Amino acid sequence: MINFLLFVLTILATLTNIWFSGVLSPAMVIRICLGGSMVVLQIWSFSRPISNETFRTKLLLEVITHRPSIAGKEWKTITYNMNQYLFKAGLWKTPYHFFCEHQCYEFFKDLIKGKYPDVQWDTANTQPFISVPENQAATQNSDVEPTVKWCLFKAAEIQAHAVREYWQSQYPDVGIPAI
């Protein structure tokens, strides 16, 4: 916010110098300053990350419901549903394109990374299991409610499955174990 104020003051000082040279009228200086500050405020408000916990839980549940592949059309459906949710919840001003499917997928990956331990695969029987370092489970997830923990676990499991299937289909001769 301080940077914003310094930015506005710099513009105001520059415009005042131009005004004194007779190029701009006082009304034009005021309009330019107000218009510029409104543009900067709009950009700032749209660049803030969504911090609504319900939004995160809804995204995880969408992933669990649709079970998307890495490059699948399911991400378009999930993205559409999330954009509609953001609009209806008042977190975005229009129902159009807060996320594209690539941004939504990246947001999802960032959401599950570090919040819950990675799902790993037992190469003997190719069944997913969770490897939780002793101190990680107690420290990172202690403030997350059980439903969200379950959603994080299940979504991470689905993501690991999708990644495995993707690479298996890309390189079938390598011998990646079937899931």
UniProtKB/Swiss-Prot annotation:
- What InterPro entries would the database entry show? DUP/COS
Name the source organism: Saccharomyces cerevisiae (strain ATCC 204508 / S288c) (Baker's yeast)
Q: Does the keyword section mention Ligase? A: no
Note whether Membrane occurs among the keywords: yes
Keyword tags: Membrane, Transmembrane, Transmembrane helix
Give membrane topology per the record: Multi-pass membrane protein
| Biological classification of the source | Eukaryota, Fungi, Dikarya, Ascomycota, Saccharomycotina
Q: What protein am I looking at?
A: Putative DUP240 protein DFP1
Query: What family, per the record?
Result: Belongs to the DUP/COS family.
> Which Gene Ontology CC terms are recorded?
membrane
Where in or outside the cell it occurs: the entry states: Membrane
Pfam families on file = DUP
- Mark the transmembrane ranges: 4-24, 26-46
